[in-house]
Amino acid sequence: MSEFKRIPPEQALELRKKEGAVVVDIRDPQAFAAGHITGARHLDNHSVADFIRNADLDAPTLVVCYHGNSSQSAAAYLVGQGFSDVYSVDGGFELWRATYPAETAQGNAE
């Protein structure tokens, strides 16, 4: 894949469950702590280098922001860093939470 793909929450959930997709959340730390997709990793300018260094570049990677806009830039960045299977989740965490409230968690980034 030379570009990222935009997908709805339904397809993102399927990728998580069937292919073990990695979920990265680029929202601010307070928003992440207040609620995020279960199993998501918080990603920011301070953690992105370590994430890239330790990541499986071929693993499906889902990028989530607030509403699905900023995640597109972050997804494009990851593709540029060598990731081959990157998705931006349309509607962001807000639509995910409305669609799958049971698939959310609270707490700070690890």
Swiss-Prot record:
Entry's EC annotation: 2.8.1.1
Source superkingdom: Bacteria
Subcellular location: Cytoplasm
Keyword Transferase in annotation: yes
Molecular function in Gene Ontology: thiosulfate-cyanide sulfurtransferase activity
Signal sequence, renumbered to the chain: none
Keywords: Cytoplasm, Transferase
Protein family membership: Belongs to the GlpE family.
Protein name as catalogued: Thiosulfate sulfurtransferase GlpE
Species annotation: Pseudomonas putida (strain ATCC 47054 / DSM 6125 / CFBP 8728 / NCIMB 11950 / KT2440)
